[in-house]
Every structure is written in C-alpha cells, then in structure tokens.
Amino acid sequence: MENIIVTQVKSSIGVKKEHKLTLHALGLRRTGQQRKHKISPQLQGMLNSVRHLIKVEKA
C-alpha cells in the first residue's frame, strides 16, 4: 500500500457539515495541519469529497 500526506489548505468555516466531519475523520482539525494515511478505496472517496479544502502528496 502506498502512503500519502494530506494537508488542509483552506478553512472549514462555512463549509457543509458533511465536509467538516470528513476533515475530522481524516484527522485534520486546522488549516496547515498534515496527516499521513495509507491509500484505500474508502480514503479515496473521502479525499474526493473535500478535494477543494486539501492538498494530497505522495509520502
């Protein structure tokens, strides 16, 4: 499995509640925070739903 680094680049203020919950599930609480994850189909769906708020890089 491949690892990725997810960074929150935009604030969650004013976004849909579902998107806020997705960011929290990814472990992102504030702008600029980073988390390392292993790629899975479930994670891909979560990243796709908040793609306008995050940046994804290969680890």
Curated annotation (Swiss-Prot):
GO terms for biological process: translation. InterPro entries: Ribo_uL30_ferredoxin-like_sf (IPR036919), Ribosomal_uL30_bac-type (IPR005996), Ribosomal_uL30_CS (IPR018038), Ribosomal_uL30_ferredoxin-like (IPR016082). Keywords: Ribonucleoprotein, Ribosomal protein. Gene3D superfamilies: Ribosomal protein L30, ferredoxin-like fold domain. It holds the Pfam family Ribosomal_L30. GO terms for cellular component: cytosolic large ribosomal subunit. PROSITE patterns: RIBOSOMAL_L30. GO terms for molecular function: structural constituent of ribosome. Belongs to the universal ribosomal protein uL30 family. PANTHER family: LARGE RIBOSOMAL SUBUNIT PROTEIN UL30M, MITOCHONDRIAL RIBOSOMAL PROTEIN L30. Part of the 50S ribosomal subunit. HAMAP family: Ribosomal_uL30_B (MF_01371_B). This is Large ribosomal subunit protein uL30. It comes from Leptospira interrogans serogroup Icterohaemorrhagiae serovar Lai (strain 56601). The gene is rpmD.
